[in-house]
């Protein structure tokens, strides 16, 4: 404690040196935080995915469709056991700020490829039977207060509906995850409904 006064007077003696020293320490911590966040963001997909999953997308953008013939070509590659479609929909719920991770998928294949996502059997069957059926992640359903049976309208700047209005979805299930890193904030609906209703 007797050296605190000496340290304080030394810090005040050369203010420029003190300021530059504190700034260099601050910059080091900021860089560490930013690089840690970048590492987490870039490695997040690897941590979430299993080693036995491969994602193939259009080289231009993830909102572009791959030709349907590619599905058979990919399925014929040795070692491939299952192929499923998934596309970025860019759904907006109520407010343009509420752009959600919304994906048209093939329900059975998607659930088979993502065993870490848990959906009760009766909800899965309802999803398979309901053309406009959709399932939401538990965190997304909690965020908006959605319950099974709700009718959810969504718009998208990417994929207009044939009738020009909002896309209408019936919430038939709420999925959860067995792995902590799995995403429970997505909104998934049937690819066949998307394919026939888009303009």
Tell what function each PLM region has.
Residues 1-32:
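N-terminal Sec/SRP start-transfer signal
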Residues 1-5, 40, 54, 134, ...:
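Alpha-helical membrane and juxtamembrane elements of multi-pass inner-membrane transport
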Residues 10-11, 45, 174:
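Amphipathic alpha-helical segments that mediate coupling or scaffolding at interfaces
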Residues 53-57, 84, 99-104, 135, ...:
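Soluble periplasmic/extracytoplasmic beta-strand elements of cell-envelope proteins
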Residues 139-141, 146-199:
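Basic-flanked hydrophobic alpha-helices used for secretion and membrane insertion
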